Design a protein with these regions (language model features):
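Asp-based, Mg2+/Mn2+-dependent phosphohydrolase catalytic module
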Residues: 1-11, 118-205
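Active-site neighborhood of HAD-like aspartate-dependent phosphohydrolases
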Residues: 2-44, 182
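Hydrophobic alpha-helical core bundles mediating ligand binding, dimerization, or RNAP-core interactions
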Residues: 25-28, 43, 62-67, 83-87, ...
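Alpha-helical substrate-recognition element adjacent to the catalytic core
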Residues: 29-66
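Metal-dependent phosphoesterase signature
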Residues: 52-98
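Substrate-recognition element of Asp-dependent hydrolases with the DxDx(T/V) motif
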Residues: 78-126
Length: 205
């Protein structure tokens, strides 16, 4: 028996709709005499990342923790300045993905943003001109649980007002894709804009 075609799309933010230029962080690290890759390494350490993704601490508090971790190496003032400069860059929208989102919405498909994010997400969406480009925002820090948890995807489907079996989820991380499938969603591991042809075929429009 063939699976029903999806009538709603849930798309990841970082790595799909938003992309980051790694040269920005590398430039900050060089400027402030930091070890290459240390900004991301500290920020993404699970002990700091998990609380901010579930809304237990704010984005600002998270960045204070990153600066505190850098302080022994470069001093408090330079650590704070480095983090501030790094954080001033908020990424870039992938124009091909945005065009796809607009296309499917115009065809009547509901589109949600499904992201592990902080309380800075709304400001980022506004700064990138995305506030009106999506029907639903499913932010882990608001939901209180993050991908790949089944509860996250249940909340996303409720927000989309669509049963899991009719939602197509797109993410660049294998764990998130696997979690979505466990929750009953169709899911595709994003590798780049070449995937858009498949996604168009998978959606009912």
């Amino acid at each position: 028996m063939s699976r029903e075609r999806a009538t709603a799309l849930l798309v990841d933010f970082d790595g799909v709709l938003r992309r980051w230029d790694p040269a920005v962080a590398a430039g900050v690290e060089r400027e402030y005499g930091l070890t290459e890759g240390v900004l991301g390494e500290i920020a993404m350490s699970w002990g700091l990342l998990q609380p901010v993704l579930t809304g237990q601490v704010s984005h600002a508090q998270w960045m204070v923790s990153v600066a505190d971790a850098l302080t022994p190496a470069v001093g408090a003032d330079r650590a704070r300045a480095a983090v501030q400069e790094w954080q001033s860059y908020r990424g870039e929208v992938d124009p091909e993905v945005l065009a796809f989102v607009r296309e499917v919405r115009a065809a009547g498909v509901r589109v949600g943003l499904g992201t592990n994010a902080t309380d800075l997400l709304d400001a980022d969406l506004a700064a990138l001109g995305l506030t009106e480009e999506l029907d639903v925002i499913v932010n882990s820090s608001v939901v209180g649980v993050h991908k790949p948890a089944k509860e996250y995807f249940q909340a996303a489907c409720e927000a989309l007002e669509t049963p899991p079996g009719r939602v197509l989820f797109v993410d660049d991380e294998d764990r998130a894709v696997a979690g979505a499938r466990v929750a009953g969603l169709s899911a595709h591991r994003w590798s780049g804009p070449a995937d858009l042809r498949y996604l168009r075929a998978a959606l009912a429009y």
